[in-house]
Amino acid sequence: GDHEGAKYPNWVTCPWPEDFLAILDWQWNEKVIPYWQEAGAFALAHNVPHIAFEMHPGFCVYNPATLLRLREAVGPVIGANFDPSHLIWQGMDPVAAIRELKGAIYHVHAKDTKIDKYNTAANGVLDTKHYSDELNRAWIFRTVGYGNGETYWRDLVSNLRLCGYDKVLSIEHEDSIMTIDEGLQKAVAFLKGVCIFEEKPTTMSWA
């Protein structure tokens, strides 16, 4: 929220009017950082080495810069649950975000987003219409491969490996025009074609 007695979130997205900056300063320095410093210490004391934040619009941590700000204040116990779907519609390049977060990615969601070029051309990407109003929304979540193609996903998984993440890709199904069963089957089949399964080579016979 934006004050001590607030009941609802208040996501500040621009620096003017100046009241917004005062809200941000209060949120971060009086609430967010102290809370997670305490929670991070508690986690470490109980043998939980990582807390993974999903960078999500509407929250204090919504992009690499805000994730790294919290990580700098709290320590490496804080990292990212990297979900590209929330970055795509904000206009970020998830591969660039992966590189920014090198060493700080602790989990990855395999989920896609499709931008509607007609609706965004008219009204931009900030959209409060219900997710079921697919035809009129600026963007919707899609099964992997239905928002971005193979080239995009090959680049994404390759950069995850290059930046030190070679673990689970957790399929998250939030595709409103495809059943869970069909979405899961298609996601598994798609990812099998783009993921790298064998260990990274330790030698290069050509170099």
Regions found by a protein language model. Name each.
Residues 1-2, 56-58, 83-87, 111-115, ...:
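Active-site beta-loop-alpha junctions enriched in small/polar residues
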Residues 1-79:
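Active-site acidic/histidine proton-transfer and metal-coordination neighborhood
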Residues 29, 64-68, 88-164, 181-182:
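Gly/Pro-rich active-site loop or hairpin
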Residues 32, 51, 67, 83, ...:
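Conserved, mostly hydrophobic/aromatic
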Residues 33-40, 44, 68-71, 102, ...:
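A structural alpha-helix within SAM-dependent methyltransferase catalytic domains
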Residues 46-50, 75-77, 103-105, 162-168:
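A general structural motif
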Residues 172-173, 199-207:
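Short, flexible loop/turn segments with low-complexity composition
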Residues 180-200:
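C-terminal helical cap(s) of enzyme catalytic domains, especially alpha/beta-barrels
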